[in-house]
């Protein structure tokens, strides 16, 4: 709403995501700057940290895999641990959304001078009933919806979402799951 961004180049990898992430984590390749020549800084907004020889900024949203590894797959834990090691060794700046996450980063061995708190921020505005109705009509959203998004991993509790849907379906047999 009222936000405009300059035209940004977008480059897709030929590698499937899982292979690309593993390649970054274990080989440091492909380099981000090879995909977008002229790039001056690389910002990884997740634990998917590309290989680069440029200044590297990484946003660390949480270190839940250290506190509750049981909520992650074995593969996920290995991936996050390896990513953390790469961030420790190679990130010039680490952004944390809260003081608690910043402290977790330091406790995990990231130098405190590289960790900066930058809170998540979003400006919201009230939406009128008329705007909601217009949007629902424009997108043919006549019914009630429950939306789940996320990766399929234990900490996302998809089985809990499906269990809740079963209960909902018993009370409202017309309820359905759509992909």
Placement of each model-derived feature along the sequence:
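Carbohydrate transferase catalytic cores enriched for Leloir-type hexosyltransferases
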Residues: 1-179
């Amino acid at each position: 709403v009222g936000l405009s961004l300059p035209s940004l180049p977008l480059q897709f990898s030929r590698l499937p995501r899982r292979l690309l992430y593993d390649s970054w984590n274990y080989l440091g390749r492909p380099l981000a700057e090879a995909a977008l020549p002229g790039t001056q800084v690389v910002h990884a907004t997740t634990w998917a940290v590309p290989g680069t020889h440029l200044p590297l900024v990484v946003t660390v949203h949480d270190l839940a895999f250290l506190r509750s590894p049981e909520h992650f797959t074995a593969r996920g834990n290995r991936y996050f641990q390896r990513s953390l090691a790469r961030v420790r060794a190679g990130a010039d700046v680490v952004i944390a959304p809260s003081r608690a996450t910043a402290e977790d980063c330091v406790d995990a061995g990231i130098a405190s001078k590289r960790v900066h708190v930058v809170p998540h921020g979003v400006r919201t505005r009230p939406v009128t009933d008329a705007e909601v109705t217009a949007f629902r009509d424009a997108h043919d959203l006549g019914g009630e919806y429950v939306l789940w998004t996320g990766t399929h991993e234990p900490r996302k509790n998809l089985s809990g979402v499906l269990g809740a849907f079963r209960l909902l379906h018993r009370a409202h047999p017309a309820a359905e799951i759509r992909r």
